[in-house]
C-alpha cells in the first residue's frame, strides 16, 4: 500500500512523445534539431515499430519519441520542459539557426524559455541551475 492509501502509484515518466509529419525529410529535421542542437542522440526504434515512421532520441533517462501523425498539427500548448545546462548558449545557437526563443512569464524562482521544434511543437527550456541557487 502506498502512503496515500492506494495499491498503485505512478513512479516517474518513462518518455515524452511528440507528433511529427510523415516522411524522411521530417525525420532529418527532427534529427538535426534534437540531436544536433539539443544534444540528444537518435537511437534506433525497435524493429516492430520502425515501419510506423518517426524517430526516438535518448540520453540517460531522457527519452523523446517523435511519432508520425498523417493529419499532423503541432502542439501549441501541451509541451515537455527540458532542463538544460548552458541554456544561454543553447538559446543563442537556436536563434542563430532560425529557431526563435521567447522568454516565458516566470514562475517565481524558475526562469523559462520556449522554442518551437521544426514542426511547431512547443518545447520549454529551463536552466539546470537557477540564478542565485
Please describe what each predicted stretch is.
Residues 17-62:
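Core segments of cupin and vicinal oxygen chelate
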Residues 30-32, 93-97:
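Short amphipathic alpha-helices in soluble, non-transmembrane regions
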Residues 42-44, 65, 100-103:
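A short linear hydrophobic-aromatic micro-motif
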Residues 1-31, 78-80, 133:
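N-terminal beta-strand motif that seeds the catalytic metal site of vicinal oxygen chelate
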Residues 2-24, 58, 69-94, 96-133, ...:
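Vicinal oxygen chelate
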Residues 49-53, 74-76, 107-111:
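Short acidic/glycine-enriched loop/turn segments that link adjacent beta-strands
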Residues 8, 55-56, 71-72, 104-105:
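Short secondary-structure boundary/capping segments
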Amino acid at each position: 500500500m502506498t502512503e496515500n492509501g492506494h495499491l498503485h502509484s505512478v513512479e516517474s515518466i518513462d518518455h515524452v512523445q511528440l507528433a511529427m509529419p510523415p516522411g524522411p525529410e521530417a525525420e532529418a529535421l527532427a534529427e538535426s534539431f534534437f540531436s544536433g542542437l539539443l544534444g540528444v542522440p537518435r537511437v534506433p526504434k525497435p524493429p516492430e515499430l520502425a515501419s510506423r515512421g518517426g524517430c526516438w532520441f535518448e540520453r540517460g533517462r531522457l527519452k523523446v519519441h517523435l511519432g508520425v501523425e498523417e493529419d499532423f498539427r503541432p502542439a501549441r500548448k501541451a509541451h515537455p520542459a527540458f532542463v538544460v545546462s548552458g541554456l544561454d548558449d543553447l538559446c543563442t545557437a537556436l536563434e542563430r539557426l532560425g529557431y526563435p526563443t521567447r522568454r516565458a512569464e516566470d514562475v517565481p524562482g524558475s526562469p523559462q524559455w520556449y522554442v518551437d521544434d521544426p514542426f511547431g511543437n512547443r518545447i520549454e527550456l529551463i536552466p539546470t541551475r537557477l540564478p542565485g541557487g
